Amino acid sequence: MGKRPRIRKAIPCAAGILIAGLAGLAGLAGLAYARGQTPQTARPQTADEAFKDIRVLKGIPVDEFMDVMGMFSASLGYCCTDCHVREAVGNIAAFAVETPKLRSARRMIALVNTINTGAFGGAKRVTCFTCHHGSDMPEAAPDLRLQYGAPPEPDPNAVGIATSSESPEPLFNKYLQAIGGTQRLANFTSFVATGTYTGYETGSAPVPLEIYAKAPNQRTTIVKMPDEDSVRVYDGVNGWIAGPERTTPLTTLSGPNLFGARLEAMMSFPTGIRQEFNRWRSGNATIEDKEFAVAQGIKTGQLPVNFYFDKSTGLLKRVMRWNQTAVGPVPMQTDYEDYRDVAGINLRFRTIVTWTDGKSTIELTEVRPNVPIEAAKFARPTPARPRR
């Protein structure tokens, strides 16, 4: 039988504007999945409050809903308009227009939920990706190349890459020493950085960027979009995103995304990272033909987080984490490159973030350490102008 090719196309319309009239399966056979327990005071807006014609997945936060859209996009190799009408690009209300693909998606979510409830006690063991693997048509027949060919290389980003209970303390000690040592890091309390941001929402063109960071865990990123700034804030407790590329004028982060914002803020002042997790595992991985030591942190209420350290230099290469959603886990990969000395601290000048909704690159050009930053920089951002 002819096999349909697996789709690996760029998805420039994904992150900010994917909206399905499917919604959360809260009303279907009782979803069971762990939500993060990160402290939070701001109530996130739910998908059915923000969007029209949400029939399933009701009651889940907007940021989780967008992660669900990312799961669909990654699993099928789809862009927004593969399921939604083309008029939805630039017109959010049109995402609610019914299409055959939306009806199929609702049925598939119900089917997968039934399998997980009946066979796995509600755990998200079967997901869209389990069958589709990047193709819109699942393959039924076995692939003989997999049976008789050379086994594929282990996935360095797999959750199960870390199998040892060995303490990660030597890895973190070497890392902290490699970036300046604990004494210098203790005196590194803030920075203001400028540079460029490149992503799907900029049309892959670099635009100006500002970062304000304060120890131990406050961070604001401002992307200077042509029409209006895109702002991401974590104030130490709450997190928000506001920008012209977003589906809602202001998104309050929740659960795994809130924890991810906290972790991102802490990575600039990493002496407390090891204490952030309840348990640790360790392992090894190969990335681009180079060996890395892996420390996997496990925090109650969250999926594991993998930290990849260069065995020779001790520097951190990658952080891999997963957001649990109503339809299963979605990955987020952050790669760190171009370490440079700034006042005795080895800082990352290039950060590449890859997730199911897109890919972005931050290139820093200047970092000013230990400068005063007014508290207002970490306040809840002003909502963006509503899109039509």
Q: Where do the model's predicted regions map?
A:
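Bacterial N-terminal signal peptides
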Residues: 12-30
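Mature N-terminal segment immediately following signal peptide/propeptide cleavage
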Residues: 44-85, 168-195
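N-terminal cleavable signal peptides for secretion/export
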Residues: 58, 149-208, 383-388
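Gly/Gly-Pro-rich "capping" loops immediately C-terminal to redox-active cysteine motifs
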Residues: 59, 88-114, 140-154
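The canonical Cys-X-X-Cys-His
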Residues: 77-87, 125-136
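N-terminal mature ectodomain segment of secretory-pathway/periplasmic proteins
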Residues: 176-247, 275-283
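Gly/Pro-enriched, hydrophobic low-complexity segments
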Residues: 224-228, 288-385
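Acidic/charged, solvent-exposed loop-and-adjacent secondary-structure segments enriched in E/D, K/R, S/T
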Residues: 241-267
